[in-house]
Swiss-Prot record:
Annotated ATP binding sites: G10, A11, G12, K13, G14, T15, R123, T132, Y133, G203
Protein name as catalogued: Adenylate kinase
Organism whose genome encodes this protein: Methylibium petroleiphilum (strain ATCC BAA-1232 / LMG 22953 / PM1)
Family to which this protein belongs: Belongs to the adenylate kinase family.
Root EC class: transferase
Disulfide linkage: none
EC number: 2.7.4.3
Positions in coiled-coil regions: none
Gene: adk
SUPFAM superfamilies attached to this UniProt entry: P-loop containing nucleoside triphosphate hydrolases
Length: 217
């Protein structure tokens, strides 16, 4: 099973990716992990990427696609792989198609923006232990206070509503078009096109996992 998981920040992709990878015995591949591994291993592409990153630049799609092609030939990808956060843009998707990277399926986890804002902006964290709460879905016994230590909880900057809105805007402008790209490609009936499936990402984790696995069956 070779698949891409798409969905807005906070849609629950990370949680579902873990279940899917366990179920199919495939690795979860993120560009960040790939870059770090290639730099550490000192591969030609890794050294090229390091040069760009050290100068504060963005690693080009050519380098990323090269890393992807190297990564998916490794033994742990024999049964497939799950791309996490890649491709992010239409040019990356085009480059992947041109490079002949084969995909079986694109799965979109669809969650309305309002639900994502509620989900993310309600998170509260106890910094020292990493314990997380949610003001609505998993509240502490006493509002704003850690159950175990009685110490105050914080809202991370990443979870503040303004930040969440900004991340959603970036998603809508850059990554959301990929959903249409893969849906349109699948609709052409091209044999090389991955299937496109969309599931609702609201409800309990178990309900969403059941939907995800049914979509992949």
């Amino acid at each position: 099973m070779k698949l891409i998981l798409l969905g807005a920040p906070g849609a629950g992709k990370g949680t579902q990716a873990t279940f899917i990878c366990q179920k199919f015995g495939i690795p979860q591949i993120s560009t960040g992990d790939m870059l770090r591994a290639a730099v550490k291993a000192g591969t030609p592409l890794g050294l090229e990427a390091k040069k760009v990153m050290d100068s504060g630049g963005l690693v080009s799609d050519d380098i990323i696609i090269g890393l992807v092609k190297e990564r998916i030939t490794q033994p742990d990808c024999a049964n497939g792989f799950l791309f996490d956060g890649f491709p992010r843009t239409i040019p990356q998707a085009d480059a992947m198609k041109a490079a002949g990277v084969k995909l079986d399926l694109v799965l979109e986890i669809d969650v309305p923006d309002e639900a994502i804002i509620e989900r993310m902006s309600g998170r509260r964290v106890h910094v020292a232990s990493g314990r997380t709460y949610h003001v609505k879905f998993n509240p502490p016994k006493v509002a704003g206070v850690d159950d175990v230590t009685g110490e105050p909880l914080i809202q991370r900057d990443d979870d503040k509503e303004a930040t969440v809105l900004k991340r959603l805007q970036v998603y809508q402008s850059q990554t959301r078009p990929l959903v249409d790209y893969y849906a349109a490609w699948a609709a052409t009936g091209d044999a090389a096109a991955p299937k496109y499936r969309k599931i609702a990402g609201t409800g309990s984790v178990d309900e969403i996992t059941t939907r995800a696995l049914a979509a992949l069956a």
